[in-house]
Amino acid sequence: NYESATQYGASTPYLAPGCYEGGAGYAMMFMAQRVEKYEKGKIIYSTSVTDLIKDESGRVVGFHAKGDNGASYTLRGKAVCLASGGFAKNPEMLKKYNPDYADFFFNCASSMTGEGIQMGIDAGGYVECENRALPAFLSSYKSKFELAFIHQSAPGIMVNVRGDNIGNIISDNHYTMAKAKLNKDNGDTFYYVFDEASAVKLRDSESYGFNGYVAMFEKGEAVHYDSVEKASEELNLPNLADSIEANNAAALAGEPDEFGRRNCPYIETRDGLWAIRVDPTFYLTTAGLAIDTDCHVLNEEKKAIPGLYAAGDVCGSIEEKDAKQYGMGFDAALT
């Protein structure tokens, strides 16, 4: 609910179409689920749309598509809805619409290549919300395994190349991750450190309905050190002990730490210390086709293009357009 969402960075309820869905094409999945409920509904897999079809009046009435098996399709209907996601895996579109992030790795579905957005542009639409600040979630450094909510499953702190605490990883987590990644003073080197009690929780975490984070131990990316001093020495983190001491002092005092983090976890180091080398990774784009509140794709005169709709990450973020920031994906679009 909204009350709990605020601790992750949500600042207002979003009830508008166009809010992005996390970068993985969820809007397309939702649409496919609805289509297959109809007796004559049919989903054609491994098939890419190549272009839209317009009639003499300029209305979008269908599209051409080509399957991986060589089959060609011409489909017509009353309207077309673009729901193919963002463009985080398209280097050229990143350079054009999010140049500040063009050189970074995006940890997202490989299908996020922006074809739907380009089709909308070719049909007369335009892109809005370019080059806004993008969020990032935590991943393991080696395998890029998603660790977005490890701070809930296994309370700990995140440190940089010197062992300095990077900040409040609870409040506004995804933007804290993004800022840490962009800050060159951090040396683009990060570790998530936690104690044995948190390690037990991490091995048996059911945050996603299955025990996913145990992979960090199975892959050998979670490493145990006999002491803080040993971890500091082997990982070359000279300030690690001081960062843990400051965190623990705040935990014992029951007060926020210097970064404003409340309820700091006490890191018990008598049984040694666990560390995972981690990497904040960007994972979606927020620029996209301009739409109205009925999900019509708009032309540059802000008029609806007849027969053309859009939903999900293929759209520009209406929440950003309204001067809000990304709400961690909990505000799924009404589209």
Whereabouts are the PLM-identified features?
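An anion/pyrophosphate-binding glycine-rich loop and adjacent beta-alpha core
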Residues: 113, 117-119, 126-235
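A glycine-rich dinucleotide-binding beta-alpha-beta segment and adjacent secondary-structure elements
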Residues: 51, 239-318, 322
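Short, small/polar residue-rich loop motifs at catalytic or cofactor-binding pockets
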Residues: 109, 151-153, 283-285
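Glycine-rich phosphate/pyrophosphate-binding beta-alpha loops
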Residues: 135-140, 174-177, 281-286, 314-331
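Hydrophobic alpha-helical segments, especially N-terminal targeting/anchoring helices
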Residues: 54, 66, 159-160, 291, ...
